[in-house]
Design a protein with these regions (language model features):
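Flexible ATP-lid and adjacent glycine-rich G1/G2 motifs of the Bergerat
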Residues: 59-119
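Short beta-strand element(s) in the Bergerat
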Residues: 56-58, 147
């Protein structure tokens, strides 16, 4: 940051030990979720992840997004009450920035539509007499468009492990049956895995297939990393029934799942098809 430019400092009431159990993947999950949600809201606002192994930088880019300064307020979100997005609670990138700074990463936002750069780091606050997270915002001329979040000091191993978070990393391909509720993932290696809009979530159900649900059908807990098993099994029953009717899953396979009392079809007896 140049010393002769006008810089505004925005202090957040977040101390370094907040969400102390969060990992690198937890933080990136928040950022990926924000990026994919933006694409859901506007199909032209494409989201992509770019990793530069030489520079050890990870860039999360949306082609049309722009950040307003009031999004630094906790609870402030443009996605609240939108049933097609995963995020609902408005904490997102601020918490990710805190965790990544704590882990020794850099976290910089290139808010290109406003010609701004937002740099984050911890500072000793004179107001709060405590170390807190702050964003330093200054003007920057650029021909680039959209929004780019750049995370520095990211190792190859950390990048490669993001497949545990996001189903669509690095052109990941898989066999699937499309339904109105989302995708049934047919590949055996995904058995039991649950995703919502491509993002992995924990689920206690013992499932025969993997599933990638549309957000509006699955209720997530506040941490957005866990879901309600009853809700999941209710929707998987509907998905299996639809796929069976379409011929994407053989009726013999469905009958076997029912006989084995698989959680995928647990709610068959409660639903009418």
């Amino acid at each position: 940051m140049k010393k002769d430019i006008d810089v505004k400092c925005y202090e957040l009431t977040l101390t370094p030990n907040y969400v102390s159990d969060w990992t690198f993947n937890d933080a990136l999950r928040e950022l990926i979720q924000n990026g994919t949600d933006q694409e859901v809201l506007d199909k032209e606002n494409k989201f992509q992840i770019i990793y530069n192994g030489k520079e050890k930088t990870l860039r999360l880019v949306n082609q049309k997004s722009v950040l307003k300064i009031n999004t630094l307020l906790l609870g402030r979100s443009s996605k609240a009450n939108n049933e097609d997005t995963v995020g609902q609670f408005g904490e997102g990138y601020k918490i990710a920035a805190l965790v990544l700074n704590r882990l020794g990463k850099t976290f910089t936002i290139y808010n290109n539509e406003k010609g701004e750069i937002w740099e984050s780091r911890f500072k000793n606050s004179e107001k709060w007499l405590e170390k807190i997270l702050a964003f330093y915002v200054y003007k920057h001329d650029t021909d680039n468009s959209g929004l780019c979040i750049e995370v520095g000091n990211v190792t190859h191993e950390e990048f490669n492990n993001l497949y545990k978070v996001w189903l669509h990393l690095e052109n990941c391909d898989y066999s699937k049956a499309e339904t109105g509720y989302g995708e049934i993932i047919l590949d055996e290696e995904y058995a039991g895995e649950v995703y919502v809009n491509g993002l992995f979530v924990d689920c206690n159900s013992d499932l025969k297939y993997g599933y990638n649900f549309k957000p509006k059908y699955i209720r997530l807990e506040r941490d957005r990393k866990t879901c309600d098993s009853w809700n999941v099994e209710e929707i998987t029953s509907l998905m299996i029934a639809e796929a069976m009717v379409k011929g994407d899953i053989p009726i013999e396979q469905v009958r076997k799942m029912i006989e084995e009392r698989a959680d995928d079809v647990y709610h068959f007896e409660f639903n009418t098809y």
